[in-house]
Amino acid sequence: MDFHLIIKSAWEGYDSSKTIRDIEDISAMVSTNHVYRITFHDEDIIIAKLSFFGKFEHFKEDHRIIQSLSNNLLYPFENLLSKSLLKNNRVYVYRYKHGKDDAWVVFYNPTRMLDRLPRRLNNEQIKKLGTQLGKFHKACSRVKNVLPKSSKTLRTDIYDLQRQLEKNPDKFGNADLIKHHCEQFLKNRSRYNMKSFEIIPVFIDWNIGNFSVTPDLDLYSRWDYDWFRMSYRLLDFYFFSRVVSDAGDRTVFSYVIGPMMEERFITFLKEYHEVNPITADEIRFLKEAYRFFILNYVIKDGKYFFNEQYAKKLQTEAVEIYLPSVDRDFDAEVIIKALKLE
């Protein structure tokens, strides 16, 4: 696919009176999604995101939800998210179809950035981040009823993985282990009082490279919406456990479960709990949120979200390390006791 040609076609469909001078690839090198900085002859700049994975309907649906969220979040988060460019009062999403090629483009206003967090946080920074996420989740909860509906659920994604395993048992390696964990996830969903869990917008992949903070460590801006979905707030927690972990946020990374059992993560959760209380059942479900993340984002869709080198490494580790550790290495009761939930 000629990505530059697709971007140019997308822009012509948006506003052919304004001409592109330069298209610069600013994509994260670990991902297969493509992000471009577009400079026009009049010096204006916008960002374009091009994707060719999954379903066009989901891509369009997600960006319409994100745009609605961006418009409806109140102070102090009213400018946290990038605004998509609109045409005729709707998010402009361009679809390119030619033979087997199928790609989609959305345009954004550039995101303003302030400070990045350090690779390894100190105790005060961990506490502040816990408070900030608690407040942000609360703000997302307040606008959830005015957002467009989402068709994706955790269950439908796991069903999709099960179908792929039935069709081609050798596709991901160790089909029996993966099937077992799919069944465990579906079975364990009913063990917790999940009807009481709120469904809010979540971004899942939080790392020090995709959000910025003010000098006082308030959340300032967030970009990169690849894993956005409407789901349980718990899906955000694993990635924050990595951000606050003793090892710190790393360039070469793995998705081990260990950071969720660290004292540093418990410190983070205590501060979160102060502003946005968590239930014991939600803490118990953290294990299932992690299991879902490995099954869906690493095994099922890893080859689309990561470049080939990372995808192979992470999928091998998923079968050999991550999944075997789920029921062995995570003890929710330690966190429940620390938070005095029971």
Where are these regions (language model features)?
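Conserved NTP-binding catalytic cores of kinases and kinase-like/nucleotidyltransferase enzymes
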Residues: M1-L85, P215, L341-E342
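An alpha-helical support segment within catalytic cores of ATP-dependent transferases
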Residues: H4-D15, N145, Q162-I204, T214
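Active-site acidic catalytic loop and adjacent metal/ATP-binding pocket
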Residues: S31-F40, I47-A48, K187-L235
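ATP-binding pocket architecture of kinase catalytic cores
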Residues: H41-V143
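A glycine-centered beta->alpha junction motif in the catalytic cores
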Residues: D101-R119, L161-D170, F292-Q309
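A cross-family kinase active-site recognition segment
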Residues: P118-D176, I199
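Active-site activation/catalytic loop segments of kinase-like enzymes and analogous catalytic loops
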Residues: L235-N276, R291-E308
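ATP/Mg2+ or Mg2+-diphosphate-binding catalytic cores
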Residues: N296-E342
